[in-house]
Amino acid sequence: MSRRHAAGKRVILPDMKYNSILLSRFINNLMKEGKKALAEKIVYSAFNKIEKKHRVDPYQIFNNAMHNVKPHLEVTSVRVGGANYQVPTHVDESRGYALASRWIINAALKRSEKMMIDKLAEELFEASNNRGVAIKKKEDTHKMAEANKAFSHFSPKKMK
């Protein structure tokens, strides 16, 4: 582990079409092997599909989906006296949106539609309506945190 100072957060430029940093982070998470143009094409095509099919603002659907999937609690593993405990902790906003985008992308990849554009469009629409696999993942995370509420006095920050 490095003894120098921690690396600073990198500045992410907002995307060109909607001027949104959150959407830019989502595109970066979707990107594989440095092919950002392809990731942008998939996201913007999914937005067009949402707009044509449901006649709603796709950027609003995206924001609702991210907000609905973003977890408020998660569990972290803490070792106390030779035993590991799953301790519920609050999720800060940055990590919450990172988890939400990861969960939406993974849920979209597992869908049965043929093209990624269709998969992403449907998963975003379902997540904005509090349905779908990504919402289930958030609920499972919250249930896990609720089940381990008894260990919340083991604060992960105090143990280190």
Curated annotation (Swiss-Prot):
GO cellular component: small ribosomal subunit
Gene3D superfamilies documented for this protein: Ribosomal protein S7 domain
Family annotation (Pfam families): Ribosomal_S7
Keyword Amino-acid biosynthesis: no
Organism superkingdom: Bacteria
A GO molecular-function descriptor: rRNA binding
Protein's GO biological process: translation
Keywords for the protein's UniProt record, in alphabetical order: Ribonucleoprotein, Ribosomal protein, RNA-binding, rRNA-binding, tRNA-binding
Listed PROSITE patterns: RIBOSOMAL_S7
PANTHER family found in the cross-reference section: RIBOSOMAL PROTEIN S7
SUBUNIT field: Part of the 30S ribosomal subunit. Contacts proteins S9 and S11.
Family the entry assigns: Belongs to the universal ribosomal protein uS7 family.
Annotated function: One of the primary rRNA binding proteins, it binds directly to 16S rRNA where it nucleates assembly of the head domain of the 30S subunit. Is located at the subunit interface close to the decoding center, probably blocks exit of the E-site tRNA.
Name under which the protein is recorded: Small ribosomal subunit protein uS7
Organism in which the protein naturally occurs: Rickettsia canadensis (strain McKiel)
Name of the gene this protein is made from: rpsG
